[in-house]
């Protein structure tokens, strides 16, 4: 009986470890490269053909942006990392149809942390967000300090298109700063275009298998973001040419 109970405890522990590891996975469709590539192409088709009518370069970039945000939210136990900027308006609030390659993050209540604590928090946040990505060597652009982090990261491309307009394939810009308190903010449910496509086509099994479920992220209130955008436009209009 003792041996049986010990074996049962071992089995339970093993299942617990597997479950914990499972919870650490976030958006793994790219691990099945052929399926990932096929999904990108299918999702880019017209609505009449069952797709989303969005260019594959945007769908792919959105996948990696969404994955970075999902990873960030999972590790942000103290609710310090707040998603903001123009990309947040589109992804969280459905305002506009802007496609971007930047992920703008602000650290809330930074003044409650020591300089070293803040520096380590920004470093950890950047590391969490960019898991599986490669930092790009861009002298003169990359900027890191105790209050900020700004760098480009590359992701593996599954499509041939290199650029559409100002959007370049294969790269993301991650910006994290603690200069302004991001308030008010709220929890918003986000999902990738690919998740939307899989839902639309009845592929819930793939969403579950590859951890493509919607997730929650702290997002700066849209009124604050829109106000900041308006102020920025006014400053630009008043500036000397």
PLM feature spans:
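Short, conserved acidic/polar surface loops in the N-terminal third of protein domains
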Residues: 92-96, 115-120, 185-187
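Active-site nucleotide-donor binding segment shared across nucleotidyl transfer reactions
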Residues: 73-103, 107-109
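N-terminal regions immediately upstream of nucleotidyltransferase
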Residues: 4-6, 10-67, 116
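Catalytic cores of NTP-dependent nucleotidyl/adenyl transfer enzymes across multiple folds
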Residues: 13, 20-26, 52, 66-70, ...
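Generic non-transmembrane alpha-helical segments
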Residues: 68-77, 124-132
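Short, histidine-centered active-site or binding-site loop motifs used for metal coordination
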Residues: 44-47, 107-111, 234
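Metal-dependent nucleotidyltransferase catalytic core
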Residues: 107-144
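Short, compositionally biased low-complexity segments
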Residues: 29-45, 95-106, 200-202
